[in-house]
A protein has these predicted regions:
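N-terminal, active-site-proximal structural segment of metallo-dependent hydrolase catalytic domains
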Residues: 1-61, 247
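Catalytic metal-binding/acid-base residues of hydrolase active sites
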Residues: 11-13, 49, 88, 118-120, ...
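Surface-exposed cleft-lining segments at the edges of enzyme active sites
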Residues: 16-20, 91, 118-136, 162, ...
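Structured beta-strand-rich core segments of catalytic domains in phosphoester-bond hydrolases
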Residues: 42-121, 221-223
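Active-site neighborhood of phospho(di)ester-bond hydrolases with catalytic His/Asp-centered motifs
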Residues: 43-47, 68-70, 153-157, 191-195
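Metal-dependent phosphoester-hydrolase catalytic domains
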Residues: 93, 146, 160-247
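Internal catalytic-core helix/loop-beta-alpha segment
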Residues: 103, 115, 129-144
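His/acidic metal-ligating clusters that form di-metal
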Residues: 135-160
Length: 247
């Protein structure tokens, strides 16, 4: 049994220093229409936020999807899944820091465990990267606690920074980096899907798809349909588009 998954960073945030509030921002129907062209079984959205999103939500509802959200209490911001109505969904758990949501999706009798994560960032200094590592450890501890890890798929924005072969003593990334992500997942028999290219600003590969041993990634790619811009509410990362099969 296979399913199609799309991960998107919706690029929503509140500019509180400018006196803005959630309703000052728009998540438009145009964004929904671009996502819906991909006809995924499930859309895993990070950087979602309660805002002016009525037409966006209506577009998915009309197309036959149900929204499942895990939002923080401060900004009403976090993870949102859109899942085809054909598939029963069970919400398992969520975190506010990092943003994380775990659901189980039942496709024709096959249960898929989906975890979507966004590691939160602040100033890119040592303390920030230490916090990112603590957030990732929290996710790992949660994975370790699961009794049922069958058909486990993890996706999202892991915010480990630029990938280097080594990290100097004066680089904050020494506290949390791509290699740590790969190694800690491998220790749990979870591997990153190889995806060509970069996912953010043309030089960072921080959005990933990871699967357990009994899932096979049939194909996975970064897809950029929104271009370069600075518009809040329009995705600024490449989407991950993938087909995954239970074996």
């Amino acid at each position: 049994m296979e399913f199609k998954i799309v991960e998107t960073s919706l690029n929503l945030r509140v500019e509180r220093r400018l006196g803005k509030q959630n309703n000052d921002y728009l998540l438009s129907k145009d964004v929904a229409e671009e996502q819906l062209k991909l006809d995924a079984d499930v859309y895993c959205n990070v950087e979602y936020m309660e805002c002016q999103d009525k037409k966006y939500m209506e577009a998915f509802e009309t197309a036959g999807y149900t929204a499942y959200k895990a939002l923080d209490s401060y900004n009403q911001r976090g993870v949102m899944y859109m899942v085809k109505n054909d598939y029963p969904v069970k919400v398992i758990h969520m975190f506010e820091e990092p943003h994380m949501m775990h659901i189980q999706l039942n496709k024709e009798g096959t249960i898929f465990n989906l975890i979507t994560v966004r590691i939160l960032i602040s100033g890119s200094d040592d303390a920030d990267y230490q916090s990112r590592k603590e957030q990732w450890d929290k996710v790992l501890n949660y994975i370790d606690s699961l009794e049922n890890k069958d058909n486990l798929c993890i996706t999202g924005d892991f915010n480990h920074g630029v990938i280097s072969e080594a990290y100097k003593e004066d680089q904050s990334r020494r506290f949390f980096n791509y290699q740590m992500l790969v190694d800690t997942l491998r220790e749990r028999n979870i591997s990153l899907a190889p995806i060509e290219g970069m996912s953010y600003k043309g030089y960072m590969k921080i959005d990933h798809l990871a699967v357990c041993d009994n899932l096979h990634v049939l194909e996975a790619e970064y897809l950029d349909v929104f271009g370069e811009h600075r518009i809040i509410g329009v995705p600024d990362h490449s989407m991950i588009v993938a087909r995954v099969e239970a074996v």
